[in-house]
Amino acid sequence: PIVSVLKNKVQLFTLPHLNNQIQGAGSFGWPPVHGGQKITKDVWMDYLQKLYMNHNGKPFIASAFPQFHDIYHQAGIHKSYGYLDSSEGNTFEVTFQTALKSSSEIIQVATWNDYGEGTMIEPTKEFGYRYLEFLQAYYIKNHEHPFNKKDLQLPIKLYQLRKKYQNNKSISRELDQASLLLYDSRTKEARDILIKHSH
């Protein structure tokens, strides 16, 4: 196999139905769409529970996903895999909580920005910051955390200002500083710079 040339031992994870094709591979969860059908909550909950309970001692990665609404048919690629509704954010919350209750050491968020399959949690006009706010609220509940909901919007503000002032070297340097502050979790200082140029 391809991994035989690697110096360090690796653990491979596949979709559950492909798991038996690679000896010793673990599985990861994914929205269980198939046959172009609309997948109900009962179906995807059953899928996740079986994955988390019946892994036969093999490692597995739990999965949290917001929905599945692919564009394959509309794009003329092939038939749609199916549809799994967001239920106004409830699907993500339930899959995340179910993943937390599993014995998995890792939770995969499926996905950050897969617009082709409609599984994105990245902020959009349709969903706003719903998914990031949920994750932030969960984290804050369990950890000391100085951030708030408005901090989630600072990267897009930085991006918009970079576009607006792309030919202004002086302001661009200040925006570079704001970027470094954001990377360093110093959101108040970064926000002050961004507000200064948001007129």
Where are these regions (language model features)?
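Glycan-processing catalytic domains of CAZymes
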Residues: P1-H199
